[in-house]
Amino acid sequence: MSNSIDSQSLPTVSPTDYARFDPDTIHEKLDASLSRPQLNTDGSIRHFLGIEGLNKAQLQAIIAKAESFFDDKGQLINRPELEGYTVMNLFFEPSTRTRTTFEVAEKRLGANVLNIDIERSSTKKGESLRDTLWNLQAMTADIFVVRHSASGAAHFMATEVTPDIAIINGGDGWHAHPTQGMLDMLTIHREAPRPFEELSVAIVGDIKHSRVARSDISALQTLGVKDIRVCAPRTLLPKGIERFGVQVYENMNECVTDCDVIMGLRIQNERIGSPLLASSSEYYKHYGITPERVALAKPDALVMHPGPMNRGVEIASSVADGAQSVILKQVNNGIAIRMAVLSLAMEGQRAHQAAGH
């Protein structure tokens, strides 16, 4: 199969086809065709499937929309922009932060919220994903928020199954986690002392299996960050990552020196088929975010982590709970970003339908 998927061929592709791709190449096969199904002809968002294919102005519009949900004191506000609409959360993978913040965001927007119990759904009885979605669509859903272990699942839904329902990607396999990427951008926008164009960002951890890393790198580059550094053992780096314009380090101390932002990543043990690390203690010794390593960064550097954290493996507790950590702010910002994406996607979907599509 070629290194890109023509959107015209997508109706014959299922999530199981995407899932067999290696994490070294999955992004190449999906990203080229992401922009077409998720945007209206005027550039407005009607699905949110990935950051790839969106330009700087579109990402800035999402950030600005998220900012509008904070009051003058920095507190989140309610705004009934989805009153009368129904959102269904379809999480085929376990989640705490993402699912909960989506639900909070939906309720703050005034939506009717339904959490589908996948473990008790008909998919566990052999029903196909396509049939499950068509049945849920018949129940007058307006938005599906989906997390799935198959890379490309959200794209599959938006193009083949339910094009008239706004699809929000809550994470798909190895491929992408776009709302996490955008909440990270909102956090940097709100907390960093310099604009994106002047920042040096270090991303540390399991890059190879991380959908967060893929979304963060894409968003950072689109927003103008020129100095993006990645650091991991060779076994946790995707092949050819250098072609994405990032600087690759194996020495953690060198990677974080004079940087403005340190992003830690979780070791994706559930996605690793065979042991790729000698031990957790060995990993922490060479790649853990410790006070000593944070001290090598700029004095006002931010420390970030998408969670869940493995303390004493990826990050020291004193750093996670320290003054430079913005990890809990990331969680709060996640509500605002998800409110923004839900609102913008529904607005775009309404415009798409009004145009007679």
UniProtKB/Swiss-Prot annotation:
Residues 1-15 have a biased composition (Polar residues). It catalyses: carbamoyl phosphate + L-aspartate = N-carbamoyl-L-aspartate + phosphate + H(+). It is an enzyme of class 2 (transferase). It comes from the Bacteria. The keyword Transferase applies. Pathway: Pyrimidine metabolism; UMP biosynthesis via de novo pathway; (S)-dihydroorotate from bicarbonate: step 2/3. Coiled coil: none annotated. GO terms for molecular function: amino acid binding; aspartate carbamoyltransferase activity. Residues 1-21 are annotated as: Disordered. Pfam families: OTCace (PF00185), OTCace_N (PF02729). Carbamoyl phosphate binds at residues 97-98, 147, 177, 180, 307-308. Keywords: Pyrimidine biosynthesis, Transferase. GO terms for biological process: 'de novo' pyrimidine nucleobase biosynthetic process; 'de novo' UMP biosynthetic process; amino acid metabolic process. L-aspartate binds at residues 125, 211, 266. One of its GO terms (cellular component) is cytosol. Its EC number is 2.1.3.2. Belongs to the aspartate/ornithine carbamoyltransferase superfamily. ATCase family. Heterododecamer (2C3:3R2) of six catalytic PyrB chains organized as two trimers (C3), and six regulatory PyrI chains organized as three dimers (R2). NCBIfam families: asp_carb_tr, PRK00856.1. HAMAP family: Asp_carb_tr (MF_00001). Catalyzes the condensation of carbamoyl phosphate and aspartate to form carbamoyl aspartate and inorganic phosphate, the committed step in the de novo pyrimidine nucleotide biosynthesis pathway. This is Aspartate carbamoyltransferase catalytic subunit. The lineage of its organism: Bacteria, Pseudomonadati, Pseudomonadota, Gammaproteobacteria, Moraxellales.
